[in-house]
Amino acid sequence: YLFQQLKKVTQVGGCDYSQTQIALAKKILNANDLQCMEADQIAEKPVYDVVLSDSVFQYFQSPEYGMRVVEKMWNKAKKMVVITEIHDEEMKEEHLNHRRQCVENYDEKYKGLDKTFYTKEMFLQFADRARAKCEFVKPQNDLYWNNKYVFDCYLTK
């Protein structure tokens, strides 16, 4: 999906914690700004019109870490920050119960691999401090069971 969207993009950069993923992206993309690093280490330069995080905030070690990444993304963006598939704290118990119903011994199998959940208030507070417009969107993919438990966040300058 993202590679299809890149046909419309003139300049692209990014980071991933996996050197393998970065090496693959460098082969496919015509981009110099691809780095293997933790998300909270991204540099503020170069800047981009839109800075996107696609379905990774759930893997960050804490909401505080995630909000540090939002700050970095905001400083790197000229126009907008888009964060997709943010796990909703209000839906946490329902989400975990659903996973327990679908996966036998879920808690045992996924011990130590917790998802990180966020409140919408965290993003609203950030938007207030940054003087940003903050919009939440519910993903619309009927084939993806996780949609019920996540939201997307658009922060606009």
Language model features with spans:
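A structural alpha-helix within SAM-dependent methyltransferase catalytic domains
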Residues: 4-7, 70-74
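A short, conserved alpha-helix within the catalytic core of class I
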Residues: 60-72
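Class I (Rossmann-like) S-adenosyl-L-methionine-dependent methyltransferase catalytic domain
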Residues: 1-46, 81-157
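A conserved beta-strand element that flanks and buttresses the S-adenosyl-L-methionine
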Residues: 52
